[in-house]
Amino acid sequence: MEGDFVLRSGKRSKYYLDKYLFETCPDILKALGKEFARHVSDDVTLIGGAELGGVALAAAAAMESGRNWVIIRNSKKGYGTGKMVEGVLKPGDVVLLVEDIATTGGQVLEAAKIITEAGATVKKIVCVIDRKQGAEENIVGAGYKFEAILTKNDLGIKDRL
């Protein structure tokens, strides 16, 4: 979609990739679950996804791989348990962290920090679409492996920023 958009990172963009179009379509979500499951090695014990965009993706990957999954919150809630991680994350767990669209990698790096602070390890971060605006460099620079199922180039999006 073309226009003038402000992204979560705070950056402005001339195009918008609507993640909800692929996250709310069962056939596409199932296919993405299979793609994510290809990254689940024997040592991976959990799938992780940050709210909101990573939740459906982590569930799809978990169903395809047979691994349990956790939701990493963006912030503590003032009600209920107030936990940052929903589901069971234990010290020593090895997590495949999935992401919808990566721009700078900020949200997924915040989620990775929460996982590591809990005593678990992030094996790899995999996103559906890399906008090619610094996410890979930031994620790899922070010491994590990173892969994208698709990039903006695969979608035929030219630089417009």
Give the predicted meaning of each segment:
Residues 1-42:
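Active-site-facing substrate-recognition patch
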Residues 36-45, 112-118:
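Phosphate/pyrophosphate-binding loops at sites that engage ATP/ADP/AMP, CoA/4′-phosphopantetheine
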Residues 40, 87-91, 117-119, 138-139:
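Solvent-exposed alpha-helices and their adjacent loops that cap or buttress functional pockets
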Residues 43-53, 124-127:
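Short glycine-rich phosphate-binding loop at a beta-alpha junction
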Residues 44-50, 93-100:
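A short, small-residue-rich loop immediately preceding and capping a beta-strand
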Residues 59-96, 104-109:
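Short, glycine/charge-rich flexible loops or terminal/linker lids adjacent to PRPP-binding catalytic cores
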Residues 114-161:
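PRPP-dependent phosphoribosyltransferase catalytic core
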